[in-house]
Amino acid sequence: MASAIPYLPPFHCHDIPLHSIGVHSFEALTLSVFQEIWGSGSPLLVTDVRRCFKFQWNPEYFIENYGDKECFIVDPQTDYSKKVTVRDFFTEFGNYAGRGTTFSGNSKKAWKLKDWPLSAAFQEEFPELFEDFSNAVPMPSYIRKDGVLNIAAHFPMNAVAPDLGPKMYNAMASDQTLGSKGTMRLHMDIADAVNVMTYATDCPDGSPGCAAWDLFRPKDLGKLQRFLKERLPKSCLDPVYSQQVYLDEHMQ
């Protein structure tokens, strides 16, 4: 578990249609560049963000500071959830040998701790991490909860503002083999989202850990829905909005 700073892996398959996205370092991203890309509705990848954080945001940190707190973790393959301590979950983080296999026997179980904390506000539950996150994000005028250009910061004081986070998402490594449900199913965000990868455990072969994202352009939503409906059971709900579909290697 020595790899605390994620790296950018090469594209895993050149047969998959790819659309270029903007890639900028934290230092090189200017307001005008961001506004042009964001205004077009395109995804943007910003590198070197992790180096802007003060805290480690790794398993050891959460075990030391929140180990006794209880939380619910979920098995994405079955949606089975159970209550454990934060220490229990993060102790197994990166432990491939002791995780057991899924019902198909094809892959290791990949427990996830999603949207943590579930009920309390992040700012109240983790004030030091909230401050660390707020001070580290790129384009703070847009992204910070109190950013002057963040529309969510301007709700009337007597109104109930939506909870737009931040939230933490922690998941053990999964794979894309046939039948896998990964750790994040296909879905559509209800608002623009900022995702910061703060930690990745090394893979069993020693290579750096990473997170794989499949992003689709909004204008391709109809094509994606038709493609999936042709390949899924007729009784299946909307393949995007139901959040029940995972794009395994066969679907890709």
Question: Predicted segment positions?
Answer:
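Active-site region of the double-stranded beta-helix
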Residues: 2-40, 50-252
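Basic nucleic-acid-binding interfaces
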Residues: 46
